[in-house]
Amino acid sequence: MICIILGLIINLGGWFGNDLIHAFTGFAFSGSRSEQSAGSAVRATDDAIGTFDKVEGNIDAGNVKFVYGDDYGFAYDNYPEKEIPKAEINGKTLKITQKVKNKNRIGDFKNGYNGAEIVITLPEDMAVDVDLHLSMGAVETKGITFGDMKLDADMGSIELDTVTVKDMDLTADMGAITVEDSVFSDGDIKAAMGGIELKNVKFDDADLEADMGGIKINGSFNELKARCSMGGIDVTADDDDAKMNLSADLGGITVNGQSVGRSYKN
């Protein structure tokens, strides 16, 4: 009976989280002025917003991604007119805010905000620090070099591909975290309802925790600490002398292809 209940929880959690995550699909945008499009959704780009070396944001709904360009830039796409994101330069920090006036309209997040997106453009020679909190939306970024990074997603996934980061702090309450072909120094990564996967990564030290979801890692690292409450841990380490401290409450642990039970420390 317990196994059946746990299975239902996991299946429902996975379905619910994926449904919400996939509610946010990216839309392309162009132009340097605000436009009115179907469904009272607004798109806009700001061509010259000044230089910055840090990005801070508090975003109620929508995806966020970073891209390289010739200059600094901020753009948004497919937001309701009354809830478009706001951006300002404060010192050397780009501050972004986006507020949903009535957060009880859960259905609107899927229907009215489908494709809502914020795009931040950086020059290739600039590695900015990032501190973003998203209530409902995903972060997807590929091929960017950052300074320190802190991402906190309440409902949505975090996907980083081919990025370089100094210190990485990632949290997803309902959504998966994936870091692929990337390099970082120290990492603190937590997922409450969703898995954590680090694919072909290189790092010095990382602390990973998943409450309801598995952890899978392959790459080169010096030290790794990982804990799972409900899920397994699978680690493939390129370095023979890599230090690991692993524990799984409800799930098995595999290290370099060998099953080691529910706890492992070397």
Task: Tell what function each PLM region has.
Residues 1-12:
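Hydrophobic membrane-insertion alpha-helices, especially the h-region
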Residues 2-3, 51, 202, 220:
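Hydrophobic alpha-helical segments and their boundary regions
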